Amino acid sequence: MFDKIPISHKPEETKIALLAGGSSGERPISLKSAEGAKEALEQAGYQVTQLDPAEAADLKALIDGGFDVAFLALHGKGGEDGAIQGFLQTIGLPYTCSGIWGSAVAIDKTKAKVFYREEGIPTPAGMTIARGDAYDVADVVAKLGDKVAVKAATEGSSIGVYIVEGADEIGRALKDGLDIDTKVLVEQFVKGTELTCVVMGSGDSAQALPVIEIIPQNASYDFESKYAPGGSEHVCPARIDDASTAAVQKHAVAAHNALGCEGVTRTDFLLEENGDMWALETNTVPGMTATSLLPDAARAVGVSFPELATMMVQMALDADR
């Protein structure tokens, strides 16, 4: 049972700065998210101005524009790492999604993994390799097996993610990953059903939405599967048993709170055939494109996209930052 967020503001009297673009590798996805968010916000009755933090003139407009809330459609570095959150807090402008701390921790897969483990949230075995570190591929294979996932630590949208097998492929993936980011997370490969769970709220009020099962057309849920039309099928609620559903939702809320997140997050999981479940990462600014999972989860509990956007604005106004 999902309890809708009570709305105490009037959308028609609320000026929204929709922040999108930025300078990260996820800029194209951010702009696509902004298209969906802008349509939803305008349908809800808001006055919406889209601004790009990568443009100095837009930053000045953000300061001087008399906005009531910044609605974040920024993905990746500069948008999900605490940077824009710190700027917005400095100028006293409420904003959607997580604060400085939650954003900074969640974007770093290596740090998030530490918090998962401390909270008893199952997550695949892994190791961190930083740019400039001496490493031995044979050591990686000995610890994690000869099939692994190599992930750029602070990139999203499956940028810098490689599923590789054998020492040669692992070595190439490590080199490529460290060209993209300053460190990589190397994880034991896990084969299973891909699941994701949206959480809304914070602390004791955080609640999980229905679990979504992701069926990618490619071998894994990569960039193309996420954003190309027809790249993946989303089944909501997921075709898993009640116990697995409850466990995913419990771990998603635990991850949301352990990382200090607020507003809306989406945590990705893998479920093996034997019932073992693994948390992979938590996204603090979930996508809002036509193929995104956040609107799908909201629809499953009877919440339209404009209604969802309104709830996100309300949580921004209510946040104690």
Segments from the language model and where they lie:
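ATP-dependent carboxylate activation and anion-phosphoryl transfer catalytic cores
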Residues: 2-14, 118-120, 241-321
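Phosphate-binding site of ATP-dependent enzymes
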Residues: 18, 165-250, 273-278
